């Protein structure tokens, strides 16, 4: 009998569950299409990856991608049973009948982003389970059985006219066995213009469409454009900003973006514990040092109006690029980190005017803060964000000092996860280090971060451990701490001007040991002037990562050298930026002296271009000739500088 109203038409599907476990290595291929959620247009250039592994694809001009990889799954050879589940759709509701599947104990329905839609324990004698109404889309249904066995299949309540339909396919069984837990990496979708997206464990769905939500901040970081930033500051406030530069106090300024008036914001000079003291004395008198002629700015859009935002941002940095005579180090470095899948600030060149007077070329750099977290972890934006707090002790105050999450009072912040991270590292042995630490850190991601950091010869980042009478510590990085269950702690790079040297200033020129070389002693070594640094390998997290995961690191580096760090790719990027900023640099009022003018800039750009093939070649030689030492030695837990 045919139903009169198709809306109530029942669609039935029987799924046979064969719990069959076997050892196999097979190839999996995902194909899909990525589109803009608002316009529906295809999105080109989306980075699609299997977690943070080397399996990466990029969408074409039609938004299509194909990602293939070999999947090695260890399984115990055993046939458990064969059962059947009746799956029925009435309207938008799914009804499951487990009458012929007595081993089923619990069901869970999940969206492709990993969120739980529905979960229920199957009560003996009550085999019928009615799930809530489902909207259009693909869902993963997981059924738990005895002996840690689990079946998965996908359901898709596609609406055809008014008639819901279901498409389901079985996946292989998974079981926790000796030697590890069988798991799948999520598919990650990243593009500078959009919020990131992930699909958790799409076991039985190999072809699908994805919609990415545009990120409003991306407009500011369009690398094809050079926008104008004009600040009107009173004479008194200008003098105050100079006088109080070391106090880092904001002063009011009227901000105009291109031809649009934004309103009153806060502005101040920006600099680390080195650059501002270099340029100002305690009275606010500026130094005559050439690097102090043009100083970076920090902008605070909500300083005088708590609700004011600038393209969803509260803060923004304008880097003067004074110490980088090529003007390319920051933008090349941040771009390379992002191309390698690392969560990194976006950046774009801009023109700056103070009271309508041209100040030259600057680089707008995204601020790692709560708004940054919201743009990178849209489903988990409220975690702690720490600046320069390495897991080296169990002091709550130590981690609270580094909190950069603006909305959360530091005194009430829960920093227990970072303390647990430190304890896992401190207590780990060579045999259980990866297992213990991977509960807090994604090692594929960490190795990719190190690969970029070492390739660009970053001599002022997390791999350089400065030493003083207060202890030792690294800097120019952030950690973001996810709040979700089993959430990880992620590194974010910062301050990239001391990069892209032809040789590593600390390792190649001053003789400090590389990160993977175990030193005979962890005594500090002299680097430049009176500055000292601890051998990087002496940090237990870094040292044991080098000792235990070197082969994985080499594979990541080999892929990077052939793609994003290849000579053609980097040279193309450099030439694009050179052409983009040429006329701006030519007019920069601070590039006028004989040793720091337009012609010297051209010379520095050419030097950087000539350095790229040398850096590529030497890095290739390094990873294939410098395997870590096998000599046994004690690791030193470094004591971080706290003030």
Q: What residue spans do the PLM features occupy?
A:
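Middle-to-C-terminal accessory/interaction subdomains
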Residues: 237, 260, 278, 288, ...
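A short, amphipathic beta-strand motif
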Residues: 30-36, 231, 637-639
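C-terminal tail/sorting-segment detector
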Residues: 74-88, 92-98, 102, 119, ...
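Extracellular beta-sheet/turn segments enriched in Thr/Pro/Gly and aliphatic residues
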Residues: 160-169, 198-219
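Short, ordered, surface-exposed loop/turn motifs in non-cytosolic proteins
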Residues: 30, 37-52, 60, 71, ...
